[in-house]
Amino acid sequence: MIPVNSLPERMERSNSVNKELNEDDIQRYKRHISLKEIGIPGQIKLKNSSVLFVGAGGLGSSSILYASAAGIGRIGIIDDDQVEKSNLQRQVIHNINELGKNKTDSAAKRILELNPNCDVKIFTERLNIKNVLQTIKDFDIVCDCSDNFGTRYLVNDACIILSKPLIFGSVQGFEGQLSVFNLNKNLSLIHISEPTRLTC
């Protein structure tokens, strides 16, 4: 586990303002603050950080909720889909009153109910080659919760160009994957290859 208080310094420069913790923050996040891996320095980094979530579906909805509850200062969400009844069984950020509404609007509403101090930026559109760099550029970290390979490779390419860490997650049935790319000059998604085949 990478302690939050050792994350890259660029996370503290989100929005070009270094926000300190106030009394409300100390009460809200006291369980975080009590952990040596986070503490007050780590919580300040979370407050001054920004994360873009690509997708507000099954994986994205849970990730967005936990990020907002943890104290991420600015959250971006890009998704062009609407809430359907069949989503509600797993996409826990949405509820029955949001049926037919944009997932981005539904997610933003729920974030602000959970943590009104979070700055939320929504993009109700599909991520594509024309908007990907502009969408990603102002966020510290990108969390890819999309459900198709075209978007995944597009996000990866943009993160390489912009030197952004990429959290890559996927879920199918009872299995899931989680990886971090482009952090501290490690591999990117496109550099993963099949394991070396052993020969006799």
Give the residues covered by each predicted segment.
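ADP-ribose/adenylate-binding Rossmann-like module
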Residues: I141-V180
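N-terminal charged helix/coil linker that caps or initiates catalytic domains
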Residues: M1-L52, K85
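Hydrophobic Val/Ile/Leu positions in short beta-strands of Rossmann-like dinucleotide-binding domains
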Residues: F53-A56, I77
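A structured beta-alpha segment of the ubiquitous adenosine-cofactor-binding alpha/beta core
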Residues: G100-Y153
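Conserved S-adenosyl-L-methionine
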Residues: A69-R74
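Glycine-rich phosphate-binding loop and adjoining beta1-alpha1-beta2 segment
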Residues: I78-N115
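Single conserved hydrophobic/aromatic residue that forms the stacking wall/gate
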Residues: I190-C200
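Hydrophobic/small residue at the entry helix of a nucleotide-binding pocket
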Residues: L59
